[in-house]
Amino acid sequence: MNILGIETSCDETSASVVQNGRVTSNIISSQLIHTSYGGVVPELASREHERLIVSVVDAAVNEANIQKNDLDVIAATAGPGLIGAVMVGLCFAQGLAYVLDKPLVPVNHIEAHIFSGFIHEGPDHDPPKEAFISLTVSGGHTMLSVVQQDLTYQVIGRTIDDAAGEAFDKTGKMLGLDYPAGPVIDRLAADGDPGFHEFPRALTSQSRTSKSYRNNFDFSFSGLKTSVLHYIGKQDPSYIERHLQDIAASVQEAITSVLVEKTVAAAKKYRINAISVAGGVSANSGLRQKMAVACEANGLRLYIPKPVYSTDNAAMIATFAHLKLSRGTTTPNTYDIAPFASFETQG
């Protein structure tokens, strides 16, 4: 079965072909136009998707060495996401499905991220037939979920203010780094001292209110941003420049330690032996290393996507559509546009 996946929920225009569960192409066009604005401009994102969608889809089909008529299913992100961006991809998918007389499978963007750790480029690979704890962490979402064998899930924690990826980007902006700042902080942190300065870790065992949040898996990163802002304001610019790598490493340590602590704690509480980490922040080398060490120390299996599948991509859309179709948990030919659909209602 050949599935074409289309992803346009934010600022990546992506198309992918998955053949019998195996990725045979994955084209991603990132919109650099937003860099000068320090963040994604929704209207510009929609226009860029309109400009790029045809060429990106054609490239994905060509790289898979098939023709459009060889496609069996069209899958596209149907939300959550920027309404205009989602509509570009989903409307294009609707039109293509109609012209080719193929079924359309709308895919929840967050669900696709959850299972991106199981994307494969070879045969005989499938998500584990066991429950696992999912940490989904990106610029727009930070949440913990218990995922069952039948693909159903329960959200047990989420950010109460800023997402982890947003914390990376906004603290990076305070430090004068280019957008998106997350990857820049990651590179700087590699040569810095994570213990240089201890920034706050809210709702954890290190916070003053730890007793109140011992069994709470929510996240909070607004206090970290405020702390970084005050810290920078007290320092001479030359001091910040000299210690930029150390400050970046300290920020990364504060964010990733919270993510790891809560994820492992959730696995212990729910007596689950596997953890999946997904979303754009899962590409962060500090998080990957820290989570791997914690999982090994606690006897937990870790599933984490290749960096190319961590950020928004269509391979995860097509792969999740294939998984749902093969498990009989979805019905194609649904054409609803739901750019603001909640995560839970899509399960």
Swiss-Prot record:
Coiled coil: none annotated. Substrate binds at T136, V137, S138, G139, G140, D169, G182, D186, N284. Fe cation binds at H109, H113, D312. It is an enzyme of class 2 (transferase). Its EC number is 2.3.1.234. The keyword Transport does not apply. Disulfide bonds: none annotated. It catalyses: L-threonylcarbamoyladenylate + adenosine(37) in tRNA = N(6)-L-threonylcarbamoyladenosine(37) in tRNA + AMP + H(+). GO terms for cellular component: cytoplasm. Binds 1 Fe(2+) ion per subunit. GO terms for molecular function: iron ion binding; N(6)-L-threonylcarbamoyladenine synthase activity. It comes from the Bacteria. It is found in: Cytoplasm. One of its GO terms (biological process) is tRNA threonylcarbamoyladenosine modification. Belongs to the KAE1 / TsaD family. Required for the formation of a threonylcarbamoyl group on adenosine at position 37 (t(6)A37) in tRNAs that read codons beginning with adenine. Is involved in the transfer of the threonylcarbamoyl moiety of threonylcarbamoyl-AMP (TC-AMP) to the N6 group of A37, together with TsaE and TsaB. TsaD likely plays a direct catalytic role in this reaction. This is tRNA N6-adenosine threonylcarbamoyltransferase. It comes from Chlorobium phaeobacteroides (strain BS1). The lineage of its organism: Bacteria, Pseudomonadati, Chlorobiota, Chlorobiia, Chlorobiales.
